[in-house]
Swiss-Prot record:
Function statement: Catalyzes the desulfonation of aliphatic sulfonates.
InterPro entries cross-referenced by the UniProt entry: Alkanesulphonate_mOase_FMN-dep (IPR019911), Luciferase-like_dom (IPR011251), Luciferase-like_sf (IPR036661), SsuD_RutA_monooxygenase (IPR050172)
Protein name: Alkanesulfonate monooxygenase 2
GO aspect biological process, one term: alkanesulfonate catabolic process
The encoding gene: ssuD2
Catalytic activity, EC: 1.14.14.5
Main enzyme class: oxidoreductase
UniProt keyword list: Flavoprotein, FMN, Monooxygenase, Oxidoreductase
Lineage: Bacteria, Pseudomonadati, Pseudomonadota, Alphaproteobacteria, Hyphomicrobiales
NCBIfam families found in the cross-reference section: alk_sulf_monoox, PRK00719.1
Catalytic activity as recorded in UniProt: an alkanesulfonate + FMNH2 + O2 = an aldehyde + FMN + sulfite + H2O + 2 H(+)
Length: 385
């Protein structure tokens, strides 16, 4: 007998850089407007998603300000917000953390983003090489963790110096959890030392298993345990043909020139090991997009970061998710284009098979029973009249 899958958290995504029905085209695009973010956040809150990721970068609305607004408009939804070592001070970030966690009644999660694009980082005033950014992040998180845990912090390091640092107003949570993704040795060392949830982009299960085993071993050597999550897009439809047609439609406006430019940018302008691994899955070729059963790399032809999607029927996608769970994944951060409609598809088609959103499913059954009783009762009255 196989053991039952471990409990699964299934987060969604707020597209603070804009949204749309097609990649590589301005047709049917949605601008990054707070009203639209509100629609998505309130929908996924009702649908049973426990949380959302808010991205960060020069082309995104600020994740902290956006999350603050959305927290006042939602009930249970958690917000995974970017913590940016090097871009802000750890002491100021700790005060932000405490304030937003209190405002949201303990619904704040932190996504540590060290950055993988030196050009964009230079625009933010960060000029450190790859491994030094992780060394700086280690100092940043050491100070941040101490402050949000209520400690008085004195620290004298290479990148930061703090004397008698403290928070007078602490977070609602004992310490908001730290999420982090980094594929390099320096990134995994940081995760093993200081973070709670180690994230990976959606590579084939065998590659994910290797990465998780490495991070798990590093953490064990430090006497720590990590949880593991994966970042994926989703294209789920009632039939396999519908799902693959939707995938093809998503990139139907992408030109060869756009692919060439995007791949050159990923490989030449970025020093992210994770981004390189994403690009190597398909090599910029349209005929190499199915990189594993139901795992499609079409998104990564032109989109940086998470570049793969699970494509198929609810049964097929559930099977793939169970494979990731079997190697240690207990959290999914999902998305789909456009994000409002695809949130409903995932919740309605996939959640029942994953055993998620059970409260909402029971409400649907209650409504169905009510209509059924009403219909049959009316039929009996009509027959007897």
């Amino acid at each position: 007998m196989t053991s039952p899958p471990s409990p699964l958290d299934f987060f969604w995504f707020i597209p603070t850089h804009g949204d749309g029905s097609y990649l590589g085209s301005e047709e049917q695009q949605r601008p990054p407007e707070f009203g639209y973010f509100k629609q998505i956040a309130q929908a996924v809150d009702r649908l049973g998603f426990p949380g959302v990721l808010l991205p960060t970068g020069q082309n995104c609305e600020d994740s902290w300000i956006t999350a603050t607004g959305l927290a006042t408009l939602t009930e249970k939804l958690k917000f995974l917000v970017a913590l940016r070592p090097g871009v802000t001070l750890p002491t100021f970030a700790a005060r932000q953390t405490a304030a937003l966690d209190r405002l949201s009644n303990g619904r704040l999660l932190l996504n540590v983003v060290v950055g993988g694009n030196p050009t964009e980082l230079a625009g933010d005033g960060v000029f450190l090489p790859h491994d030094e950014r992780y060394a700086q992040a280690h100092e940043f998180l050491t100070i941040w963790r101490g402050l949000v845990s209520g400690e008085r912090v004195n620290f004298d390091g290479k990148y930061y110096r703090v004397e008698n640092g403290r928070l007078d107003l602490l977070p609602s949570q004992e310490r908001p959890p730290l999420y982090f993704g980094g594929s390099s040795d320096a990134g995994q060392d940081l995760a093993a030392d200081l973070v709670d949830m180690y994230l990976t982009w959606g590579e084939p299960p065998a590659l994910v298993a290797e990465k998780l085993a490495s991070a798990r071993k590093k953490a064990a050597l430090r006497g720590r345990k990590l949880r593991f999550g994966i970042r994926l897009h989703f294209i789920v439809r009632e039939t396999e043909d519908e799902a693959w047609r939707a995938a093809d439609r998503l990139i139907s406006h992408v030109t060869d020139a756009q692919i060439e430019n995007a791949q050159a940018r990923f490989l030449n302008q970025m020093d992210s090991v994770g981004q390189r691994r994403m690009a190597e899955l398909h090599g910029g070729r349209r005929d190499r997009l199915v990189v594993s059963p139901n795992l499609w790399a079409g998104v990564g032809l032109v989109r940086g970061g998470a570049g793969t999607a699970l494509v198929g029927t609810p049964e097929q996608v559930t099977e793939r998710i169970r494979e990731y769970q079997a190697i240690g994944i207990d959290t999914i951060i999902g998305s789909g284009y456009p994000h409002l409609e695809e949130a409903y598809r995932v919740a309605e088609l996939l959640f029942p098979r994953l055993g998620l959103g059970t409260r909402r499913q029971q409400a649907h059954r209650d409504i169905a029973n009510e209509f059924s009783v009403g219909f049959h009762g009316a039929a009996r009255l009509q027959a007897s009249s």
